[in-house]
Amino acid sequence: MSTAHRIFVFGTLQQGHRNFHINRGRRVGGDWATAQPHPLYVIGPMRLPWLLNRPGQGLQVIGQLYEVDDAVLADMDRLERLDDPLWYERRRIAVRPHPGPADAPAEQVWVYFGSEAGFADQTVHAGPIDQYSLSMAAVHPLRMP
């Protein structure tokens, strides 16, 4: 029997974005936001969304919350290259429904933080920002018009 995992997505795994086909989970409600500010950047030649694990810096990041099973979480982990120290790491983060009251109970869920090593020496195209939009994704050099 597979376990249900809740994961906050803020980049290419969001509905409408280029890696959404990997995200075969069930969306939970509308938008969600990090309970604490975190810096989100668009970096490098691929213009990747890069959320750093620096609570208290940046802005509250807006994204989507999904419930996924073990197989989908494993597919997401492969996409995000958890075995490579220059890519992402999966950690817990507190999120709340957005918009919503600041004192609403926060939920602890999974998120992919970009590694500090992967951030170093990259060109920063935008950030800190509160949301990775479709218009930001549209300028990805591998995206076809």
Region locations from a protein language model:
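Glycine-aromatic micro-motifs
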Residues: 2-145
